[in-house]
Each structure stands twice: as structure tokens, then as C-alpha cells.
Amino acid sequence: MGMWEEASDTGMKGKKKKKDKNEEEEEERGKKERMVNLTLEMIYLLTGEHYIPRKKSDDGGALHAPGSVIQKENNKNDEKILELMSNIIQLLTGEVAIRTHHVSIYFSLDEWDNIKGNKVLYEEGIKEEPQQLHPLDCEYEDKRDITADLGGTLCYNNETSKIGAEGTDFCAKENLTISPVEQPPPANRIKEERASCEEGNQSDCSINPLTEQIQGTDKPTPIMGYSLNNSSANYIKEEVVQCHEGNHSDMRIITAPESILETNTSAAMIRCNLNTSLSASCEGGNQSDCRINELTEQIQGTDTPTGNIVLYICSECQKHFSTKAGLARHQKTHSVFVGEEHAYGRIHTEEKPFPCSECGKRFARRQHLTDHQSSHTGEKPYACSQCEKYFPHRSNLNRHLKLHKGEKPFPCSQCGKRFPCVSDLNIHRRVHTGERPYSCSECGKCFKHHSNLTNHQRTHTREKPFSCTECGKGFKDRSSLTVHHRTHTGEKPFSCTECGKGFKDRSSLTVHHRTH
């Protein structure tokens, strides 16, 4: 009887094993059929045509091979299917995927061009076996291991733990994660600082080291300004937070490094996302209160088409900057600080809060107003140290200094004459083009220079703002006043090279030259 039952059990096991095998084969056939249907549907979406699959006939008859050979062929087919699907995803999304075990990491095409030579290195880093994490010298029910695996639960506890007054389950569900958008190379490691539970009654709520979760996203968001290189020795340090009241259990929080070395090499980016303001209280039995201090670091940014990594965007003009200081400097161009009154001349609004009391002309900055007022007063505060000539504006002095240095970096393309600044070159070009952009509103006469127009307009208004301090005679321009001063001083700076006779102005010298 016993032998019959044993034989019957053996037969049942064989049937069950055969049934399980048949179910697996059926499931495999169903999976392949679904894949074929999805492929045909994809072909229809791409071409708009329906196709019917037809089994390929073997001319040489059926081939019989051992099961291991067939299994290898199936594995190769699976790998080929995955490769084809990756190529399709790359065409549709512009992203290249590296898949290893549970991890999927997506790279943009620009990033992939930079790192595809190190594909094996990335895969080796991803394939590292999950680390087994154990409670340290603590009583732990049924001695279960907690694997630092993807999506793993942080800790187990028989009794429900709560966070603050919310009553939220902490030990069973709460996750603190550092989520790399793209896996860093193996050179970057996690350093664990061991902690030991003090002797005595231990809390039932043993909170094990928080695990690192690697999450692959369809659209990764790299951190701008922060990158990791294969050679960098930066690592994420695991800090130990201890409860200091009574009997307690140790708690660990993985914190992001304060600074990540920035390199020129395109490599894996990481995003730190730590939950904020956690206050955990383990209740029940002989337990102690635990507190997790606020720990938050969230780095965000957007990538640029050029591959440069940026963080900060100007809200006025949308210009990108890699540092906060650079953005702050740029924003001052939108709000120009003026004097002690804290008045602001807005570039975009063209506000000009400083008017000239003489002519009513307005300026955005007080310094510009001060420079302009010197044209009314005749003040020339800027002196040349080489020839002691004076100028009303610093820009005029800088232009004059180039004459002493012999700097004339701007040549005319027509005649080859060179000039110390661009503005002088632009004015000179009007000689060749005949351009006279400044016209008089009274008579329509045109002039090459704005100063000539200003002097001409005074003939209509009969304005003579420049008066002689000796005799009080007025003149419409400063050059006429300067020439007049020479009648009082007797100065004759222009001399004839033929006879040596001197003249007080250049025009008189030109008339004299005609006599020779």
C-alpha cells in the first residue's frame, strides 16, 4: 500500500511538472503573439498599411538541436528584439537607453555622443550587486535582511509608527531617497559610517540604513552646473543621526555632499531630493522619541541646446547664467542704480528721471547729467597728463590719449586712413558716401555732424551761449570764442612754412598760402 501511494505521488508530481511546463510554454506563446500584434500595429501606424505574418518555410527541412542551443538562440533573439526596440525609442524620443537588470538610464543624443565610448564602464557600475544591509547588533524580529534594492521598503516593524500628529505610517512606508537621474560611475562610492546600538533595552522600531533608489525617468532633468567625472573621488556620505534621550535606536540619513566637483567632462548627473521637515516618533513598548531634523537639498535646472549647463534665467530677457552671482550682475543692467536717491533708470522702460535745468534734456543717470551740464558751463574737468589739454568728458580724454599712443586700430576700407575709435571712423565714412544724416527743421539744410547742425540752428534762434570774459562779446560756438580770445592774448599758433608769418586761425593761414 505504501509503495502504491509513493508511486501515485511520483506520478502526480510528474503530471504537475508537465502541466507547469505546458503553462509556461502557453504563456510564452501568448507573450510572443502580443508582441507580434503590437509590432503589426506599429507598422500600420508608420505606413498606413495592414500586413499579415506568414511563417517562413525551411528548404532544408527541420533542424534538430539540443535544448541548450535553442535556449541560446532564444536569448539572442530577445537581445535583438530589445536592441531594435531601443533603436525605435531613440528615433521617437531622441534618447538612448542603457538597461541593466532593474535599472534603466536614459541619455540625450548629445550626452550619448560624449559617453558612448565608456558604455561598458557605465554598465559595470550599474550591474554592481545590491548590498545586504543588516541591523547592527540590534534585536530584530525573525532576523530578516533588508536589501538595498530598488523600491525596497525601508524597515519592518510589528507596531505602527507615526510621524508627528499626522498619524502617517513611517517605518512601513516612508522613503528618503537620493534619486540619481543618471547613474554615476563606479569611482563615486557611498561611504557608510557604522553605528552601534547601545546596550540595554532596544526599541522595537529599528530603523535601518536608508537605501539608495535609482529611478530611471523618461525625461531626465540634469543638474546644471554640477557633473561627476570618472576620476572624481566625490562620494555620498552617510551621516548618523542619533536619538539622545533614554533607550533609543540609531537612525541613518544619506545626505548629499555639500559641493560636487564640477568638471568639463560630460558625465552622470545626479539629483538630490530629500524629504523635508520629518519629525518621527516611534511609539509603543519601551521606545524613545526620535527626531529627524529638516534636511533638504533640491537642485533643479534645464539643459541648453549648446550642451552648456546652466542654472539661472533672467525673468526680464530670459538670458541664461551658470551662477547666481552672474545673474545678479546682469539684473543690474535692467535696474541701473543712480546716486543716493536710489532712483532707477529702467533700460526696458527708458525712464530718464534727471532733467537738465538749462535746456530740459533728460538723462537716465546723474553722471550723464553732470557730463552734459559741462557743455553749458564750459567746464573741462578731465586733463591729459601729457599735453595738459582738458576735456569735458572722460570718453573724450580716452579718445585723445590714443593719439599720444599712436593707436589707430580702425582703418577705412575705402582710403585706408586709420582712426583711434569707431565713432571717428563712422563719421569719416560720410566723406565717401556723401551722407548728411542731420537736417535742420527750419530750412532743411543737412549736415554730416550733429555739432554742425547745433551751431547752424543758432543762426535761426540768434542764440550766442559762449561769451568772452574780457569784452563780453557772444559767440554761437566754442571754437569761435577760442579764436576770438587770441585777439586779446595776441597768440598766433598757425605759422606759414614759407615765410614764417603767424596767424590766429587755420582759415587765415590757408588764405595766406594762396599768395605764395
Swiss-Prot record:
It holds the Pfam family zf-C2H2. GO terms for cellular component: nucleus. One of its GO terms (biological process) is regulation of transcription by RNA polymerase II. Residues 200-218 have a biased composition (Polar residues). It is found in: Nucleus. One of its GO terms (molecular function) is RNA polymerase II cis-regulatory region sequence-specific DNA binding. PROSITE patterns: ZINC_FINGER_C2H2_1 (PS00028), ZINC_FINGER_C2H2_2 (PS50157). InterPro entries: Znf_C2H2_sf, Znf_C2H2_type. Residues 1-33, 200-220 are annotated as: Disordered. The keyword Nucleus applies. A zinc finger (C2H2-type) spans 312-334, 354-376, 382-404, 410-432, 438-460, 466-488, 494-516. Keywords: DNA-binding, Metal-binding, Nucleus, Repeat, Transcription, Transcription regulation, Zinc, Zinc-finger. May be involved in transcriptional regulation. Belongs to the krueppel C2H2-type zinc-finger protein family. This is Gastrula zinc finger protein XlCGF53.1.
